[in-house]
Curated annotation (Swiss-Prot):
NCBIfam families: coaD_prev_kdtB, cyt_tran_rel. It catalyses: (R)-4'-phosphopantetheine + ATP + H(+) = 3'-dephospho-CoA + diphosphate. This is Phosphopantetheine adenylyltransferase. Belongs to the bacterial CoaD family. Its main location: cytoplasm. Homohexamer. The record marks 18 as: Transition state stabilizer. It comes from Chlorobaculum tepidum (strain ATCC 49652 / DSM 12025 / NBRC 103806 / TLS) (Chlorobium tepidum). ATP binds at residues 10-11, 18, 90-92, 100, 125-131. It is an enzyme of class 2 (transferase). GO terms for cellular component: cytoplasm. The gene is coaD. GO terms for biological process: coenzyme A biosynthetic process.
Amino acid sequence: MSKKAIYPGTFDPFTNGHLDVLERALNIFEHVDVVLAENSQKQTLFSVEERFDMVREVVRDLPNVSVDVLREGLLADYARQAGASAIVRGVRQVKDFEYEFQMSLLNRHLYPEVTTVFLMPNVKYTYVASTIIREVSMLGGDVSKFVHPYVLDQLSRKRAERRAH
């Protein structure tokens, strides 16, 4: 088993597909840091604090998992400072791989000691994307099969807030 990996993402929200990739990573690495990106270029439904709370709640019973936030700077620098030997990325489709492959090459250039590990989720999650979950949930659709009950509650709360405004 390898040492430590980081699993970065926006996780807006954290889905069962994300959880599946994390659990697969724990079969390979001794410890995985789930790292939430505070990406100013992405419009998110949940604040980074809300996303942090959701991920922490979902993974609280998983051993050897921690949750952190990357507020600024490069992921490669974060990986170096964290002592990570790998960056875990979930890949559902070919279009995911194209982008992730480019990012892995850049990260390898910036931090040659890190390896990007691409993991495919269970086939039942290949079409589950946070964007779709957000959209369906905000329109009142049932996404309970795709997210943890705590995340479902937070999506319902957001939907109620939006209706109130």
